[in-house]
Amino acid sequence: MSSTKTIGIIGGGQLGQMMAISAIYMGHKVITLDPAADCPSSRVSEVIVAPYDDVDALHQLADRCDVLTYEFENVDADGLDAVIKDGQLPQGTDLLRISQNRIFEKDFLSNKAKVTVAPYKVVTSSLDLEDIDLSKKYVLKTATGGYDGHGQKVITSADDLEEANALANSAECVLEEFVNFDLEISVIVSGNGKDVTVFPVQENIHRNNILSKTIVPARISDSLAEKAKAMAVKIAEQLNLSGTLCVEMFATADDIIVNEIAPRPHNSGHYSIEDCDFSQFDTHILGVLGAPLPAIHLHAPAVMLNVLGQHVEAAERYVTENPSAHLHMYGKLEAKHNRKMGHVTLFSDEPDSVVEFGKGIDF
């Protein structure tokens, strides 16, 4: 890159913080917009303290920055459209709108990107649930909002319909047939508007709908891994992607099914900071700046463990007992239960021997 840029990041959580660190290493200046003055990004960047939907604050950020990006998908797309200049938000707001609404997302994945998704139907009220086949298992998800399992109801029998009907009557939903999968996996892919680069396939283990452990490379066949990466690239190319995208998938014995996309760096890609020659945050910054993207090389098999609020002391003990482990703490002031406080990355080719911090204790 020929010159220093000022990059505006909407969102000052851990993802914004790690984006900022990558940008600063490359010589750029970072300004963050976040409602909290003591957000994680405040440790590494200037912060404009304001709500995300504050149009005046968005104007200020846009006026002071060459390029804008966001660390999460629940950003006011209309507000951004009102303040950005042409080309100032390389990720665009179309990607935001797709990822903010599961109905739009399913339509994009199945009909435009033409990748395999679980059978689904749009649900506008409980009337749409009256004729479902209860010999099958389903997941009902609100079309908008919801994360880490919020806004979802699993339907396995008629006993679940009362709660499902209430959810369906409260908001538009998507009803997905439950996938009998072997593994949950994800693929990180980054683009610069022209080209893409793809990371290794990651295997993800969730507890209470929160990511607990990521294993890289995923323990699937080479042919399935290549299929997963090809599907992620296909999605990225259909989006004309700038920046980093995570594609979450299910791996069955002989197929890959796409679950959802996140239009930003992702928790499951944090291992890349130590384990790849360029991290998902590096390629995100390169991508939104339109810079050339490198091929990604994995240094060694690795495991990433999430550190939740109830795990902080255990994680600190762990790294004193395993000094080759890499501990990242995000600088959040209050260690709330199930709040993501940090992560640990450890090189290991025996992933089952790396025990999650809360396993058998507090999941």
Regions from the PLM with identified roles:
Residues 24, 84, 110, 134, ...:
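Anion (oxyanion) recognition and catalysis
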Residues 1-100, 104-107:
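ATP-binding N-terminal substructure of ATP-dependent carboxylate-amine bond-forming enzymes
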Residues 91-153, 158:
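A conserved helix-loop-beta module that forms one wall/lid of the active-site cleft
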Residues 123, 152-157, 188-192, 216-218, ...:
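Short beta-strand-to-turn element immediately C-terminal to the catalytic PLP-Schiff-base lysine
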Residues 3, 286-363:
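Peripheral (often C-terminal) accessory segments that flank ATP-dependent C-N-forming ligase machineries
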Residues 167-220, 226-258, 262-270, 278, ...:
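Phosphate-binding core of ATP-grasp and ATP-grasp-like enzymes
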Residues 60-61, 132, 167:
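Structural alpha-helical scaffold elements that stabilize or flank donor/cofactor-binding regions
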